[in-house]
Amino acid sequence: GCFRMYITDAEGKEHNIPFAAEGDWIYDIDSFHATTPSQSNIQALEASEVIQIAQKDLYYLYLNILKLDRIFKVVTEEKYVELQNRVFQNISSTAQQRYLSFLKQYPNLANRLPNTQIASYLGITPEFLSMIRKEIASGQ
């Protein structure tokens, strides 16, 4: 299945942060490790199978299966790089460039997600996303 993590602003508008699909994982890293309430929400966008683990159980596995600890560190670093790149793109890229980056990062989700979800991730309206898609399709 597919998930989204999102926050809701003061006006009640939802803003998607990342998506996660089959074989991926998604969680509020700050909330999980600091054991504090989450500032974000996670929603399944499709029928999904969820595997969850308690913090103490994950820490136990880290201590007792060193290879697992290394795998989680590598995955966490990869997710951090993705988030860092997204921040850089939001600051310095056009909406079309951000959409092309989305297609590269989430190639299997572009046809599975509604325009509203993708537009929220890109920080644009669904109508503007449709315009971008038309421009790309026409080769402009």
Each predicted region: which residue ranges?
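Alpha-helical bundle regulatory/interaction domains
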Residues: 64, 68, 72-83, 91-92, ...
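Phosphate-/nucleic-acid-contacting segments
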Residues: 93-140
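A short, polar/charged loop-to-alpha-helix boundary motif
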Residues: 14-17, 135
